[in-house]
């Protein structure tokens, strides 16, 4: 979790794929640590950058696709979920970190069924 925490600004905000909002590294880690140690302990993520838009020399916005491949530790067993992430990145001490992140699960708007994008 130390490497995960290092990605974020101290006062970062995070909205997970279920709409749960937290603020600050401690709350972000508190939200993620239990699932990383249990249901996602044998899962992997594949990320694909869509775009980066510079707002200033020290602030940019990025969008990227993320595919979670859950393993046997997940109660539903092995399966995949695609999400679209939006981040606001800030440069701090010549290094980029996440100031804000929002994660949205791809679903069918009529049924709520989780859908996978075509790769």
Regions found by a protein language model. Name each.
Residues 68-79:
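Short, cysteine-centered beta-strand-loop-beta hairpins and adjacent loop/turn segments enriched
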Residues 45-47, 63, 79-85:
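Short, surface-exposed coil-to-beta transition loops
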Residues 118-119:
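Extended, polar beta-sheet/loop recognition surfaces of beta-rich domains
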Residues 65-66, 102:
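A mature extracytoplasmic/lumenal domain signature
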Residues 14, 62, 98-100:
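Short hydrophobic/aromatic-rich beta-strand segments that constitute the beta-sheet cores
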Residues 82-113:
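Short beta-strand edge/turn micro-motifs at domain boundaries
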